[in-house]
Amino acid sequence: MGLIDNIKKEAMGNRTKIQSSDAAELEKILNNLFYLDKNIEEETKFVEQVMTRGLESQERVGLHASAMLVGEKEFCLRAQVLSLIYKQSQGEQVPVGLMRIFKQGDAIHEKWQRMFIRGNYGSARDMDRTRVCDEYMLSYTPDLDVKIPKFFEGRMIGEIKSVNTYQFQRMTKHPSAWKQAQWYMHLCINRLKKLGKWNVKDYTKGFVLSEDKNTQDFKIEVYDYDSSLVAPFVDRAESIMYYYNRVYEQHKMVPRPKDATSPECKRCKDCFMREACWGIGKGKIKIKE
């Protein structure tokens, strides 16, 4: 075991934070947000935005950026292609225990988003705003799209995560949020490049803010954009578009994975495209074009 590993092990035993100098600097800046007065006008806009979010349509349509980030065992190319053609299963009612957890997570997100507004690091429209990548027929919704001049001269993507105390005390970084941060940075950079508006700095840095939902302590991870880390996600998105176009050009659908043996098998029973894939329930209902 190397020196760094020993330091990490000892720190976890002592419940000590391990952060880069960048992360420590950003944490200090964010701690100052707790002392600021409310920005009534902009926070009111944000609250209205939160309260009216999703009223236009409750139906899930198209790809979501997070679908590119799952592990190999969870990723299903066929399901993603089907989701661009047919309606998705909207799911059963979520158990109340899970709803309580979701609501707590929402509250933590909204608290931080309002504080970033107070710091004048972003406006209401920079918080939880869904964007669309036409190239991949894909939507993505960064928690934060902010600019903190004291820390970095460009705009940054930020992801907020609420975690339990056990996980918070033991983790040196959030297990999956770095993927979101890198992927969203990539999508934002590409969008600006296509518009001819990228200034070389924006979205080349991002961060993850993890809060202990019991103690309100928080940790920061800072990341520089790395195109090599998002290459697998880009490959998946491009594969989906290739096979989607093949459906119309060659009338061939992606075959099911080998372990997708029946609608009731472990691989398929909770799939969001199960009905369209197997022709059961409501079956294949085409999305209106």
Describe each region flagged by the PLM.
Residues M1-I157:
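Metal-dependent nuclease catalytic cores that hydrolyze phosphodiester bonds in DNA/RNA
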Residues Y136-K179, L192:
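Non-catalytic protein-protein interaction segments used by genome-maintenance enzymes to assemble
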Residues I18, R170-H174, I189-E289:
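Metal-dependent nuclease catalytic regions and adjoining charged, substrate-binding loops involved
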Residues A107, K111, K179-L187:
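Short amphipathic alpha-helical face segments that pack within enzyme cores
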Residues Y86-K87, K161-T165, E211-T215:
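Short connector loops/turns at beta-strand edges and beta->alpha or beta->beta junctions
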Residues I157, W183, F207-V208:
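Structural beta-sheet core signal
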Residues M115-G119, L187-K194:
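Active-site catalytic microenvironments for nucleophilic, acid-base chemistry
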Residues E92-Q93, Y166-Q169, F218:
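Short small-residue beta-strand/loop micro-motif enriched in glycine and branched aliphatics
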